[in-house]
């Protein structure tokens, strides 16, 4: 996982820690790959108010919900591309962007550069 994701669990109540575990489980099930995935959907899955979910994510991860989602999407994309490159598999970068949950290529490139420090072409030497 990209090193930018921290987990600050200090001061969480037992209930909040339970929500944290549920959030991790959902993200491990790759709910972020749905381009329409949003805070209201996550909150409904948790049966927790959206405002509280947002505050909990900010406390635990030190970032907004959408930044966290996009970080997971970039990480998924990175893992896929690394797998393809190491196995000599051809891929379509636009398809992989969509598969990662991004429905806007420009938005993807902005986040990729923000998190990885380079464009995908530079990062993977494509």
Model-inferred region functions:
Residues 51, 105-106:
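Key DNA-contact positions within bacterial/archaeal DNA-binding proteins
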Residues 1-95, 100, 111:
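Membrane-proximal linker segments that couple transmembrane helices to downstream signaling/catalytic modules
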Residues 33, 125-126:
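Generic structural signal for short, solvent-exposed loop/turn connectors between secondary structure elements
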Residues 64-66, 118-125:
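Short, Lys/Arg-enriched C-terminal cap helix and immediately downstream tail that follows
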């Amino acid at each position: 996982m990209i090193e930018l994701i921290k987990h600050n669990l200090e001061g969480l109540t037992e209930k909040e820690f339970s929500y944290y575990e549920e959030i991790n489980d959902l993200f491990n099930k790759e709910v972020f790959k749905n381009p329409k995935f949003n805070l209201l959907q996550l909150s409904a899955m948790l049966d927790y108010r959206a405002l509280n979910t947002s505050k909990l994510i900010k406390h635990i991860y030190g970032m907004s919900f959408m930044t966290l989602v996009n970080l997971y999407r970039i990480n998924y994309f990175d893992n896929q591309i690394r797998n393809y490159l190491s196995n000599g598999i051809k891929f379509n970068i636009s398809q992989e962007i969509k598969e990662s949950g991004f429905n806007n290529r420009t938005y993807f490139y902005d986040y990729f550069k923000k998190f990885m420090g380079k464009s995908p072409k530079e990062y993977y030497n494509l």
